[in-house]
């Protein structure tokens, strides 16, 4: 609902940043999220990227790269793709603490709303803030809400998006 996005979520983000000195720290996540992320921090990852590779949209995933290109060019990412963008950073970094540091860095550096309380709400939602535990428990994610590029392709018309934001798109 548009009212939720404009009022409820905006005010919740501001309230969290004003009332919690550690709003931008890993330890500010809900206990369940910290536990599940810590339980899976050492899970094997198929891909690991460093901050430079993320910054330059140099991953194996065309959808993720397109989202990063949009972020760098326009200072924003389509809302649904922004969620996927963050979830993949969690999946492709050595542990959730590094993922969070990359998320904050990329968001603050490139997003028009970087450093805004709403932006921090979005970044921390990726790791479980303002969400609930989800099942089944999965490697890397644990009980954190899971998203894939494949499932995104079924919910979002990617062809024009990839034509605009990908390098050498074949979609």
Locate predicted features.
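N-terminal targeting leaders only when they are immediately followed by extended low-complexity/repeat-rich tracts
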Residues: 1-2, 163
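Gly/Thr-rich phosphate-binding loop signature of adenosyl cofactor/nucleotide-binding cores
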Residues: 3-78, 142
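Structured ligand/cofactor/substrate-binding pocket environments in proteins
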Residues: 3-14, 72-121
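Short loop/turn segments at secondary-structure transitions that flank enzyme active sites
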Residues: 9-12, 22, 87, 129-132, ...
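C-terminal, helix-dominated tail/subdomain
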Residues: 26-44, 51-54, 99-167
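Active-site proximal loops enriched in glycine and acidic residues that flank catalytic Cys/His/Asp
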Residues: 67, 85-88, 94, 127, ...
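Charged, low-complexity, intrinsically disordered terminal regions
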Residues: 170-171
